[in-house]
C-alpha cells in the first residue's frame, strides 16, 4: 500500500531509471461524480501530463504507461470509441509539446486493431520524437504481457525454422531481446493506482525483479505528491536480485572502495 513517509528529496541513486504505471481508476472517479466514464478518461489524460512533468524534473529516463490492454477491447463499444477519439486527440495536440520537451514517444502492443488514421498518428509521433533523449515515454496500447512473450517466442521459432538459430541457443537473454522494451533497462518501480493489487497482464517478463507499489489514489487524482511517496518508499527498499543482504552490503563496500 502507499507509504506515508515523506522526505524532501531522494538521492540520485534512489530515483528509478524506469518507471512503469498501470493507470487505474478513471471510470470510478467519474462515477463518484455522477459523470460519464469518458470524463474520467479526460481527467486521466491530465494526470499523464503531470507524471511526465515529474519524471522530467526528477531525471527518470524511461516511463511506461499501460493505456489500453488487449482485453480492454471487450469493454462497451461506446467507451472504446470514446477512448480512441481521446487517444487520437492526444496525438494530434500533444506530440508537438513532447517534442519540444525532449520526450521520445513509443508504442508497444498490437497496432493492427487500431484504425488506419490512428496507426498513422502513432507512427508519426514516433518518427517526430525519435531523436529525443530526455525521457523515453512508452505507451502500452492493445498490449498484453502474455501476448508479448508469445510474439517473442514466435519470432525465435521463425529463426529456428529458417536455420538461423539452433533451439539450444535459446536462453533467457535471447528471449529478453525479443520482448517489448528490450533496449531499455527493466522497470525499477511499478505503480498501480486505484486500489487493486495485481499487475493485470502488464509487462510480465519485464517486471521479474521490479519493486511493486500500490495506492488507493484514483488515476485522475494522481499527482507529484503521490509520486513522491512512491519514490520515498522505493528509496528505502533493498533490491537484492536473489542475493542476500550481506552480499549486497559487500558489493556496496567494494564499489565504494574501488
Swiss-Prot record:
What biological processes does GO assign it? cell wall organization; peptidoglycan biosynthetic process; polyprenol biosynthetic process; regulation of cell shape
Q: Name one GO molecular function term.
A: ditrans,polycis-undecaprenyl-diphosphate synthase [(2E,6E)-farnesyl-diphosphate specific] activity
Tell me the active site. 24, 72
Which Pfam families does the entry mention? Answer: Prenyltransf (PF01255)
Q: Where does substrate bind?
A: 25-29, 37, 41, 69-71, 73, 75, 192, 198-200
Reactions mediated catalytically: 8 isopentenyl diphosphate + (2E,6E)-farnesyl diphosphate = di-trans,octa-cis-undecaprenyl diphosphate + 8 diphosphate
How is its cofactor bound, per UniProt?
Answer: Binds 2 magnesium ions per subunit.
Q: Which InterPro entries did the record assign?
A: UPP_synth-like, UPP_synth-like_CS, UPP_synth-like_sf
**Highest taxon of the source?**
Bacteria
**What Enzyme Commission number(s) does the record list for this chain?**
2.5.1.31
Query: Gene3D superfamilies this protein is in?
Result: Decaprenyl diphosphate synthase-like
Coiled-coil annotated spans? none
* Cofactor(s) the protein needs: Mg(2+)
Q: Which UniProt keywords apply?
A: Cell shape, Cell wall biogenesis/degradation, Magnesium, Metal-binding, Peptidoglycan synthesis, Transferase
Q: Which GO terms describe its cellular component?
A: cytosol
Q: Which residues bind Mg(2+)?
A: 24, 211
Q: What does this protein do?
A: Catalyzes the sequential condensation of isopentenyl diphosphate (IPP) with (2E,6E)-farnesyl diphosphate (E,E-FPP) to yield (2Z,6Z,10Z,14Z,18Z,22Z,26Z,30Z,34E,38E)-undecaprenyl diphosphate (di-trans,octa-cis-UPP). UPP is the precursor of glycosyl carrier lipid in the biosynthesis of bacterial cell wall polysaccharide components such as peptidoglycan and lipopolysaccharide.
Q: What quaternary arrangement does the UniProt entry report? A: Homodimer.
UniProt lists the family membership as follows:
Belongs to the UPP synthase family.
Listed name of the protein = Ditrans,polycis-undecaprenyl-diphosphate synthase ((2E,6E)-farnesyl-diphosphate specific)
Query: Which gene is the coding source of this polypeptide chain?
Result: uppS
Amino acid at each position: 500500500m502507499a507509504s506515508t513517509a515523506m522526505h524532501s528529496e531522494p538521492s540520485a541513486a534512489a530515483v528509478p531509471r524506469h518507471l512503469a504505471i498501470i493507470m487505474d481508476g478513471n471510470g470510478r472517479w467519474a462515477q463518484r461524480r455522477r459523470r460519464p466514464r469518458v470524463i474520467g478518461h479526460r481527467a486521466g489524460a491530465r494526470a499523464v501530463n503531470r507524471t511526465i512533468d515529474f519524471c522530467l524534473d526528477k531525471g527518470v529516463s524511461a516511463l511506461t504507461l499501460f493505456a489500453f490492454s488487449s482485453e480492454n477491447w471487450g469493454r462497451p463499444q461506446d467507451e472504446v470509441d470514446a477512448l480512441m477519439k481521446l487517444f487520437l486527440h492526444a496525438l494530434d495536440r500533444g506530440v508537438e509539446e513532447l517534442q519540444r520537451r525532449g520526450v521520445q514517444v513509443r508504442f508497444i502492443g498490437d497496432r493492427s486493431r487500431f484504425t488506419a488514421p490512428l496507426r498513422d498518428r502513432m507512427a508519426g509521433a514516433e518518427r517526430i520524437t525519435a531523436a529525443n533523449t530526455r525521457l523515453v515515454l512508452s505507451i502500452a496500447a492493445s498490449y498484453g504481457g502474455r501476448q508479448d512473450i508469445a510474439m517473442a517466442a514466435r519470432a525465435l521459432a521463425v529463426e529456428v525454422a529458417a536455420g538461423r538459430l539452433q533451439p539450444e541457443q535459446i536462453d533467457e537473454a535471447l528471449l529478453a531481446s525479443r520482448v517489448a522494451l528490450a533496449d531499455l533497462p527493466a522497470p525499477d518501480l511499478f505503480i498501480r493506482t486505484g486500489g487493486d493489487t495485481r499487475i493485470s497482464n502488464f509487462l510480465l517478463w519485464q517486471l521479474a525483479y521490479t519493486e511493486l507499489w500500490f495506492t488507493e489514489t484514483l488515476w485522475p487524482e494522481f499527482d507529484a505528491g503521490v509520486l513522491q511517496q512512491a519514490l520515498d518508499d522505493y528509496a528505502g527498499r533493498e533490491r537484492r536480485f536473489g542475493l542476500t543482504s550481506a552480499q549486497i552490503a559487500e558489493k556496496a563496500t567494494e564499489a565504494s572502495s574501488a
